[in-house]
Swiss-Prot record:
Name listed for the protein in its UniProt record: Elongation factor Tu
GO cellular component: cytosol
Annotated stretches, region: G2: 60-64
Domain tr-type G, chain residue ranges per copy: 10-204
G3: annotated segments: 81-84
Binding of GTP, residues: 19-26, 81-85, 136-139
Source organism: Wigglesworthia glossinidia brevipalpis
Family in the record: Belongs to the TRAFAC class translation factor GTPase superfamily. Classic translation factor GTPase family. EF-Tu/EF-1A subfamily.
Gene encoding the protein: tuf
Keywords: Cytoplasm, Elongation factor, GTP-binding, Hydrolase, Magnesium, Metal-binding, Nucleotide-binding, Protein biosynthesis
Lineage: Bacteria, Pseudomonadati, Pseudomonadota, Gammaproteobacteria, Enterobacterales
Region (G5): 174-176
Residues binding Mg(2+): 26
Job of this protein: GTP hydrolase that promotes the GTP-dependent binding of aminoacyl-tRNA to the A-site of ribosomes during protein biosynthesis.
Amino acid sequence: MSKEKFQRIKPHINVGTIGHVDHGKTTLTAAITNVLAKKYGGIPKAFDQIDNAPEEKARGITINTSHVEYDTKIRHYAHVDCPGHADYVKNMITGAAQMDGAILVVAATDGPMPQTREHILLGRQVGVPYIVVFMNKCDMVDDEELLELVEIEIRELLSQYDFPGDEIPIIRGSALKALEKDPIWIQKIIDLSEHLDNYIPEPKRIIDQPFLLPIEDVFSISGRGTVVTGRIERGTVKVGEEIEIIGIKNTVKTTCTGVEMFRKLLDEGRAGENVGILLRGTKREDVERGQVLAKPGSIKPHTQFESEVYVLKKEEGGRHTPFFNGYKPQFYFRTTDVTGSVELQKGTEMVMPGDNVKMLVKLISPIAMDDGLRFAIREGGKTVGAGIVSKIIV
């Protein structure tokens, strides 16, 4: 069966749901696809279709990132439903990296919770530029004053992490009631879609820069070869173009023999799109998550760099104790962790939680990088710092 061509008519925007576990992120994702499919066409998705990876069933919490698509009046959205549970923050980092904007879901019954804060902080770290808030479960709160207090609390929390808390749209709704086809609550989902259209500007795609795609996953398709998936960070890739696989191992040249998006074939992939790229003559075991595909010669792998780092406070889920020269955490770049060691500046004996420091980092495996690349510092499965590459050394 030949695959249909993907129609590019409306501008394409990447969004995702973030927020505390059980506040209704997946229910909201289902409600959006159902309400908007009815209004603007598209395929509605049920809750359990979105909550669809095997681990999720066992624990009743979202682990993997689910992708859905929907149309609004003026745009086409690709939407990731991000994991809510603290154990899966690593996945959230990869999910949040794919957002032109995020929908922060906060249950009106609870108000902001620990993971609400953690996800806002992560959004700040991984560069989510815009947040729209959906205050969920408002059907369960009769007290208008309580709703206002929760709203104030959300705005203050956003401002604390340098988002414009006073300007951010907050929509009061009920995802479950909208799924149950209650017209009052359906309208709230439509309101949300209009706020997404109006508040999140169409991103300035870095389409003219050299092609770069951080690899998220690798598949082997019998008879066709190896496919890598990820979101194109910049530039474009056309079928037939030569590209390089960079980072972790030695740099290898290959050729793009196919581009797919949402199971439809494209002639080229563009910045901002989640795509699968078919690679000529590349074995499944030669490629891994954490590498990048890029235009030949446009980016190099490096292991040593100077960085500007913020070390999280204990209250933010960071370390409880200082660290010293030679500290060896994991450095999380784009889609993967790499172990590295830290060299502090002369005169800096130790780094306390809450400090902002310059440090030299030496990685055990090379990573494709430019100045300005952001990373998270992690240990024992939790984020303990956020940084940016200020100067590449080697």
